């Protein structure tokens, strides 16, 4: 009986320490995911695993997870109205390219400017160095992407405006 009780106590202690460690990892993940650069990194991960918000019509919530309403509306409308054909977004908007051979990919630390966070994604595509800047704003649901800035000041929003 004593051995049984000790075994139960030891197992309970092990279980509780595991729960505590899991809780700590979850808190750390939540804290990291609350940053602008974490949202951008998650967007790239989702797109790489073919579960990104672009070119899909299954889930508006997936678009809203990453983008502020204005840009989200444009992305969603483009996906829905293009019906599997090429829409306004005619390449991968995360790399500003149709063909990709990505090397030296990095997401920089966010910097604040005029109440917005700016996050740079840098990489080489077929040997050409590129920087794409994400403009994020913080709302009730956390950080969301307001626009994406490409070379020479062209933006994802401007692509939609030019297509009208």
What are the residue ranges of the model-derived segments?
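C-terminal segment of classical bacterial N-terminal signal peptides
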Residues: 16-24
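Short, low-complexity N-terminal intrinsically disordered segments enriched in polar/charged residues
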Residues: 24-57
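Surface-exposed, charged secondary-structure patches
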Residues: 27, 67-128
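Short beta-strand edge segments in extracellular beta-sheet folds
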Residues: 135-137
